A protein has these predicted regions:
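Conserved S/T- and glycine-rich ATP-binding loop of Class I adenylate-forming
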Residues: 6, 37, 102, 108-111, ...
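Structural core segment of the AMP-binding/adenylate-forming
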Residues: 8-84
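Conserved sugar-transfer catalytic core signal across GT-A, GT-B, and GT-C glycosyltransferases
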Residues: 2, 104, 157-159
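Conserved pre-ATP/AMP-binding loop-to-beta segment of ANL
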Residues: 76, 80-107, 114, 137-143
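Short hydrophobic alpha-helices that are characteristic scaffold elements of the AMP-binding
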Residues: 3-9, 30-31, 152, 161
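Conserved structural elements of the adenylate-forming
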Residues: 86, 99, 118-140, 144-150, ...
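Active-site-proximal glycine-rich helix-loop-beta segment
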Residues: 10, 33, 106, 112-114
Length: 161
């Protein structure tokens, strides 16, 4: 849900390895162009060090506190986002925008040095889903998260996936 919320707000998701050192986190933040961080409470110390190194203000850190986890003193819970009001999510329904709009920046394992960023578009994720999960071919082409339905016959963006 977090990834979809980030995309819906017009952002680009990136995730890190919880065992990263502050230096590795700093590299990840710079390479991914991260502006905000949502972190588990257990790894706040290396996150703070990387944020200081990369110039991300502490006000841009939210703690992902679920179940019985607590937010460290002086920090904000990710749940503060719920009090920010509501806005419609970013939408587009054309193939070109889907192919050119970044959805995530994922990283290689870094076998020859530090991990390298790879930008995946919305179209990349749709293609991956089609390859993995859509064994039976649909009678229509899917090219975005919003697509006309075969039953509508109007070519309008009337059904969300």
């Amino acid at each position: 849900m977090l990834v979809l919320a980030i995309n819906g707000a017009g952002g680009v998701y990136t995730g890190t390895n919880p065992s990263y050192t502050p230096m590795e986190l700093g590299h990840h933040i710079r390479a991914s162009h991260a502006k905000f961080i949502i972190s588990e409470p257990e790894i706040i110390a290396p996150i703070h060090a990387a944020m200081k190194e990369t110039g991300i203000p502490e006000s841009n850190l939210l703690v992902f506190d679920v179940l019985s986890q607590t937010v460290p003193a002086g920090l904000k819970s990710w749940q503060t986002l719920f009090s920010a009001g509501e806005e419609d999510w970013v939408r587009f329904d054309d193939l070109k925008t889907c192919e050119e709009t970044a959805a995530a920046r994922l990283f290689s394992s870094g076998t020859t040095g530090l991990p390298k960023a790879t930008t995946l578009t919305h179209r990349n994720f749709i293609a991956q889903h089609e390859l993995v999960f859509e064994i039976e071919k649909r009678p229509y082409q899917v090219f975005s998260l919003t697509q006309s339905t075969p039953s509508s016959g109007k070519g309008d963006a009337s059904e969300s996936y």
